[in-house]
Each structure stands twice: as structure tokens, then as C-alpha cells.
């Protein structure tokens, strides 16, 4: 079996209940999410802008092709997971990008997740109505 000469950088991103496996390959700036264009995958442009933030910030949007496999969660969670995955893959390409990405707050994983429902309550915190008599 031959070993390929293609250089690829991988990053894993998580947000809420979404998990994104990102692969950066030197190329012309194409982006594929689950084998689809971002415009066909996400419902609006704001989510796509949020996802592409690390590439725009480091001016590498036209340098790498981005291939993403993402599962779980909704559109915002998936975009956040992809953003973190792209950030981690970019740090593998050049370590000096980490300071700029950290200043923009892109390196840290957003650990906020939905709070679980407790028994005796209607939701995580919503209690039944109190009756005095």
C-alpha cells in the first residue's frame, strides 16, 4: 500500500450535543459539510459566517479546502462545533495563529449544555404552581 503525499490537518469540535470532525487540506477554499455546500446545509448566512470566523480571522479562507462530518444537535450547535474544529486544525498548521485565535475567543470550548430535567419539576427549574390553601 502506498502512502499518499497529501497533507491534511484534523480537528475535532464539540458544542452542546454536536460533534464535528474537520479536515483541512491545502486547496482553493472549498467547504463541504456532510458532502454538501454550506449554503445548502445551513438555513441562513449568519450561521455560515459564524462557522467561517477562524478562516476569515487568519486570512486562510482561500488557502485550505474544508471537509466536515458533523452529527447531532441543531444548526447553531453544529456551527459552533465546526468553528472549534476548524480552529484546532488551523493551530496544527501554524502554531503562531493560536494567539490571534485565542484573543478572538475561538480556542476555548463553549461548555454550556442543556440542564437536565429534575423529578418533581416541570423542567430543569420550573416548579409546579404553589397553592397556599
From Swiss-Prot:
Keywords: Ribonucleoprotein, Ribosomal protein. It comes from the Bacteria. InterPro entries: Ribosomal_Su5_D2-typ_SF, Ribosomal_uS9, Ribosomal_uS9_bac/plastid, Ribosomal_uS9_CS, Ribsml_uS5_D2-typ_fold_subgr. One of its GO terms (molecular function) is structural constituent of ribosome. One of its GO terms (biological process) is translation. The keyword Cell membrane does not apply. SUPFAM superfamilies: Ribosomal protein S5 domain 2-like. One of its GO terms (cellular component) is cytosolic small ribosomal subunit. Belongs to the universal ribosomal protein uS9 family. This is Small ribosomal subunit protein uS9. It comes from Ureaplasma urealyticum serovar 10 (strain ATCC 33699 / Western). The lineage of its organism: Bacteria, Bacillati, Mycoplasmatota, Mycoplasmoidales, Mycoplasmoidaceae.
Amino acid at each position: 500500500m502506498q502512502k499518499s503525499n497529501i497533507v491534511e490537518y484534523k480537528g475535532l469540535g464539540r458544542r452542546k450535543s454536536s460533534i464535528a470532525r474537520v479536515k483541512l487540506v491545502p486547496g482553493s477554499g472549498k467547504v463541504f459539510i456532510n458532502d454538501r455546500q454550506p449554503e445548502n446545509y445551513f438555513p441562513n448566512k449568519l450561521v455560515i459566517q459564524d462557522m467561517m470566523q477562524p478562516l476569515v480571522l487568519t486570512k486562510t479562507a482561500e488557502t485550505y479546502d474544508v471537509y466536515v462530518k458533523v452529527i447531532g444537535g441543531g444548526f447553531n450547535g453544529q456551527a459552533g462545533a465546526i468553528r472549534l474544529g476548524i480552529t484546532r486544525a488551523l493551530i496544527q498548521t501554524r502554531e503562531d495563529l493560536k494567539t490571534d485565535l485565542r484573543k478572538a475567543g475561538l480556542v476555548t470550548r463553549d461548555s454550556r449544555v442543556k440542564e437536565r430535567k429534575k423529578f418533581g419539576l416541570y423542567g430543569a427549574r420550573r416548579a409546579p404552581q404553589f397553592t397556599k390553601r
